[in-house]
Swiss-Prot record:
Keyword Transmembrane among UniProt keywords: no
Protein name: FAD synthase
Residues engaged in binding ATP: T21, F22, H26, P27, G28, H29, D104
Catalytic reaction(s) noted: FMN + ATP + H(+) = FAD + diphosphate
Family membership noted in the UniProt record: Belongs to the archaeal FAD synthase family.
Originating gene: ribL
Listed pathway(s): Cofactor biosynthesis; FAD biosynthesis; FAD from FMN: step 1/1
Subunit structure: Homodimer.
Molecular function terms, GO-annotated: ATP binding; FMN adenylyltransferase activity
EC nos: 2.7.7.2
Classification via PANTHER family: FAD SYNTHASE (PTHR43793:SF1)
Amino acid sequence: MLAGYYPSPGDLLTRVLATGTFDILHPGHVYFLAQAKALGDELFVIIARDSNVTHKPKPVIPEEQRLEMVDALKAVNKAILGSEKDMFEPLREIKPDIIALGYDQRFDTEILEKELTKRGLPAKVVRIPLSKECPLCSTGTIIKEVLKRYG
């Protein structure tokens, strides 16, 4: 899955991981990923599977298309789809040093760090604050605006 993306033996790179649904990709996503990349040398992104999105409406954009769009962003070294069964599964292969959470992601940083350590993945968890306000920096806001204009 990640062949060709590991550094050579002896290289010490800081690997950052970000996760998310990234439905209807917008500037807020791009700002978040740029800030996450600034925490290290490599940025890996796990895209939530359609079947795993249960805390909000199902994505409008199918997972494969969301994966393609995020993987094409300049800040992203590699994007992959998450596991449908175990959210920690891809982390075992990526082996992140830092996990970047968005300001609105529902994880508790301390609990997540404990769960990671328990699974032999001692990554530091960092919450990225809301960095830039913009009128259409949320998927929900974009959908509401589209409905207002065309609904």
